[in-house]
């Protein structure tokens, strides 16, 4: 090991909690990625750990090996390593993060799962709801678990993604479990509406005051939102965003509360 920089990076199997410790050590600024100097530090530590296991790490220059490494693991080629990409590199116990993402691999599936587990329509998944989510995930993946392990996974996910420490996960926090290319909610960052702005735009499209809009009205609303923010959106993107958001709807009726969860600045990131 190189000094005391990352005591858990020893390439033995990591528990979920140990994996989180490694992640937080290298994601020093807490932005959800390892990039730049963080990535360089991680790679140097990884090479040092590999030397300790007898893996030859002298064959190429550090720069060459970093390029090869990023080509293999940086799946969306953005020059950053995100949490699930790191889970593929480190021998994480049962690789629970990848297991999670396989369960909600697309934004549409994610929104379906959100609606199913946000049972009280609060706009949050609380610890007990998250526990049910993870239990179903593990059953679907045929992964054996006991109550203690389920509790550890629940608490670890909360520690990873509960950015404001309130013991519950908002939609924007929970969506960080999605691969970046599937996380359509990231597309709305910088376009979040205040409650007043949201109420005004919803009222404009809910012309009959029914309290809900349909998919055609949602189409128009999303186009309007993008145009006002001078952002471009393809027909395919619009279709995907609409489909994902409509998974929150009740029989094709998208109520104010469901859309507010997606478009408003709260819950805070």
Curated annotation (Swiss-Prot):
Protein name as it appears in the record: Calretinin
Keywords on record: Calcium, Cell projection, Metal-binding, Repeat, Synapse
Primary residence: other
Binding site for Ca(2+) 3: 118, 120, 122, 124, 129
Domain EF-hand positions: 14-49, 61-96, 105-140, 149-184, 193-228, 230-265
Ligase found in the keyword field: no
Pfam families, per database record: EF-hand_1, EF-hand_7
InterPro entries, A to Z: CALB2, Calbindin_Ca-bind, EF-hand-dom_pair, EF_Hand_1_Ca_BS, EF_hand_dom
Family annotation (PANTHER family): CALBINDIN (PTHR19972), CALRETININ (PTHR19972:SF4)
Taxonomy of the source species: Eukaryota, Metazoa, Chordata, Craniata, Vertebrata
Localization: Synapse; Cell projection, Dendrite
Binding residues annotated for Ca(2+) 5, in chain numbering: 206, 208, 210, 217
A Gene Ontology molecular function term of the record: calcium ion binding involved in regulation of presynaptic cytosolic calcium ion concentration
Role of this protein: Calcium-binding protein involved in calcium homeostasis and signal transduction. It plays a critical role in buffering intracellular calcium levels and modulating calcium-dependent signaling pathways. Predominantly expressed in specific neuronal populations, influences synaptic plasticity and neuronal excitability, contributing to learning and memory. During embryonic development, it facilitates neuronal differentiation and maturation.
Coiled-coil region: none
